[in-house]
């Protein structure tokens, strides 16, 4: 009898694990994760002191891009440096953090809001070698053409039907196994 109790306990555990796994499978099909994009600051020119007539070089570069959490920016440079700074450090070219100066550094944009970067060389920063970007929380889903009402209902039913089928298959397999094992006792 003790062995049967152990077996029933194991099967209950198996059913719980199966239900959780089925739920994860369903949520994975419904909630896709976002993979961020990677941008090279300054494009092909990279991170360098802008020419005197282009002190807004990096502001113009960033204006054409919408940054989101999970994106990353790479600074590629020669004989220079880059440091992440706060708002004060950006506007006053005052870098107090350790600077990267190995030719390339990648920063993950992991929080919404403004992010500030500058050359650790205050003179370069004052000449425009600094970057301020606004990072958005998440991209909004792109609008897609609305299907005809019948097509929309069919597509929605097919998506929820396939997710439900996977969860039910796991549950039925667990119940069948339990029935086979208990039938032997």
Curated annotation (Swiss-Prot):
Annotated propeptide span(s): 157-185
Lineage: Eukaryota, Viridiplantae, Streptophyta, Embryophyta, Tracheophyta
UniProt KW keywords: Cell membrane, Disulfide bond, Glycoprotein, GPI-anchor, Lipoprotein, Membrane, Signal
Protein name: Early nodulin-like protein 17
Expression (tissue specificity): Expressed ubiquitously. Accumulates mainly in anthers, stigmas and ovaries.
Organism: Oryza sativa subsp. japonica
Subcellular location: Cell membrane
MF GO annotations: electron transfer activity
Encoding gene per record: ENODL17
Residues with glycosylation annotation: 79, 94
Lipidation feature positions (GPI-anchor amidated serine): 156
Effect of a null allele: Reduced pollen fertility leading to lower seed setting and altered yield.
Keyword Lipoprotein applies: yes
Topology class, membrane: Lipid-anchor; GPI-anchor
């Amino acid at each position: 009898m003790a062995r049967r109790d152990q077996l029933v306990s194991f099967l209950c555990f198996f059913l719980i694990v199966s239900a959780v796994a089925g739920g994860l499978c369903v949520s994975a099909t419904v909630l896709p994760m976002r993979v961020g994009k990677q941008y090279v600051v300054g494009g092909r020119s990279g991170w360098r002191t802008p020419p005197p007539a282009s002190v807004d070089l990096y502001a113009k570069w960033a204006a054409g891009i919408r940054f989101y959490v999970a994106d990353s920016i790479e600074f590629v440079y020669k004989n220079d440096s880059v440091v992440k700074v706060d708002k004060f450090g950006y506007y006053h070219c005052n870098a107090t953090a350790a600077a990267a100066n190995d030719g390339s550094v990648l920063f993950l944009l992991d929080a919404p809001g403004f992010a500030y970067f500058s050359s650790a060389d205050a003179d370069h920063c004052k000449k425009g070698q600094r970057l301020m970007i606004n990072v958005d929380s998440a991209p909004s889903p792109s609008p897609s053409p609305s299907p005809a009402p019948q097509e929309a209902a069919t597509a929605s039913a097919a998506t929820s039907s396939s997710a439900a089928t996977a969860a039910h298959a796991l549950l039925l397999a667990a119940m069948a196994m339990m029935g086979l094992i208990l039938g032997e006792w």
